[in-house]
Amino acid sequence: MCIRDRENIMEEFVSNFIEEFRNLFINDKDIKSIIAIGDGIANLKKVGPELNITDKITRDQFRVLYHKVVETTPEVLSEKYGVPYERATLMLPMAIIYQSFLDNSRAEDIITPDVTFCDGIVADYMDKNGTLLLNKNFDEDIIASANSIAKKYKVNRKHTQNVTQNALDIFDSFKSVHGLGRRERLQLQIAAMLHSCGKFVNMNEGTMMSYHIIMSTEILGLSHKEREEIANIVKFNEYYLPSQTKAQVSLMTADYMKVAKLASILRLADVLDKSHRQKISDMKFSFKDYVLTMTVDTLNDITLEAGVFKTKTELFRKVFGVKPVLKQKRGL
């Protein structure tokens, strides 16, 4: 089999997977750069010394590298560019994979930082043990990842945005009582964003479908435990939350009290937009004698929301020992 035949077969095989990846995760996103690390990309850079590549490979530069690898045998690549033979045999499939990523993402270049996967493992270990402090805040990346999932499952954007904002406002209104921090607030935000994504799969079993979607979908920047907690927050937004002893088996590694607290907040935020017409926003809060009063200044008829609200406060009262009250102020 000639080199060109091998290239065509590999390209056809690889493109199938890359196209599936594009359809699932990229869609219409504007991808400007691909980041590549490891020996594979480092060896490919050796093939074009005349290109003076440092930490970025343009599309045109990569096309030159690609043709050189396609037209050269592993034996020659190894001898001419000082690449170990076993690594040289991998250069053609690596070149095809990167070229396919460029074609399918329409990225402008490939960024090649001088780091390896092992560097990442060491940095992660040092960060967790307090010997290295990473200042990068990944919240925006996590939210962007959740937004992609919400878009994929065609959630009602206006409804989820309203529920999300109300949930965060409730969370912020009595911090001194719930004792939860920034990370838990982020989990509540993601749960609110994805609480109805399962309706795209099954309208009648939307909540359980949402649970399964979150459990089976990686969210960049979240641990498996955090994602499991978010899935259960969404589940118990609608379903009855049993006692800790009975619930622990189904919760697996999730923290029961965290799930209970955040699910109780999400329940209130969700019913505040029961009609899906965004009648309630910009609430004013007052907390006194363990009563959390939510005052809404609106001329809208919130009879539906107010009625259902009263049926959704039990878990909140049990978990926090706080009575939530919804009041309407009909201002002009």
Question: Which residue ranges define each predicted feature?
Answer:
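Helical "lid/coupling" subdomains associated with nucleotide-phosphate turnover
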Residues: 4-267, 273, 288-290, 294, ...
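A short amphipathic beta-strand at an alpha->beta junction
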Residues: 108, 320-332
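Low-complexity, glycine/alanine/valine/leucine- and proline-rich hydrophobic stretches
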Residues: 272-324
